[in-house]
Amino acid sequence: MTRATMRDIDEMDFNIQVWDYMNWALGDRSLGFDRRLHWMGEPVNVTTFQNAGKPVLEMLDEARTIAADNDMRVWVAVQHVTGMDVTGSLVLIPPEAWTRLSQLDTNRELDGIHFIQLAVGNGLGVVSLYQFALLMNHFQPLGPDESKEV
């Protein structure tokens, strides 16, 4: 197997891990490649990057292009962090996506976000995948609601 093929497999594996986690966290098994995540009715494009060494600007440009191709105004890039499980991956929220999320945030839920890093080059917000899942779940507990199970 070529090195490029192995990289592609690693990227796909990381993508699957991210969506498996988001499916579990939000209790929605239909999220992923063809089904989009939504927040306050707005679709959110999530692009994953397993390569922790990839330059941030390159990742953001690629994620922005993918979102634009899908006519999505809110988008984020999820970057793997070497040595961390999937929940410790970094979610990069660009200023334009943050602005749109803020416009939709009538309940001021975004006030509950604690950035790992803010203003990394022109206002880029960085949170963990766990925090991003909490935001997408309106700060409700993550995972299946066991009180509903029989």
Predicted features, each with a name:
Residues 1-33:
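Acidic-basic catalytic patches of nuclease active cores, encompassing PD-(D/E)XK
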Residues 13, 27, 32, 71, ...:
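Short, flexible coil/linker elements and helix-boundary hinge sites characteristic
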Residues 33-38, 112-113:
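Short linear loop/turn motifs
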Residues 20, 25, 40, 45-101:
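Catalytic cores of nucleic-acid endonucleases
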Residues 80-150:
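Domain-level recognition of nuclease-like catalytic cores that cleave nucleotide substrates
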